[in-house]
């Protein structure tokens, strides 16, 4: 069933890819990424993963600001990845792969940091994704999850926007999901309206 959902979501984002970097979307992500990176802690020679990388905006910015950084972008959509590769000015340090967050094709403890921006809401099994994030993070590494949130009293909120819908999680719900995966919440930060950054740490 999950595989069918991923296939449908892939088609949804493939169709969106040629228009994804329109001015409105670009301005939105520019603002979100700028605020998010104010809280990001990256070591020298950082190895980073961006799950749901889309057209590669965040990784390009990270590479421009961190000259020793090596990054991998993962996305369901071949068309999104084609856009990311065509815009990749840092091909010696960035690469893009097809895949989903519930089955990461990477080694244990491979990354210093993992990013996920406005993508977690699409994942049908968030517990699986967070367990995979914890697996590929180095001990002491950070997971930066930026996504739309809801008030605590509303619980989770489901919206039929894309195949299988999208789901928004309250700060408390994020904390619980992370705890189950071995990820401790360091802090929450509101970035832009209801977009909340939750910083997780993998316990050393």
Per-region residue spans from a language model:
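Short glycine-centered segments of the SAM/dcSAM-binding site in methyltransferase folds
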Residues: 47, 141-142
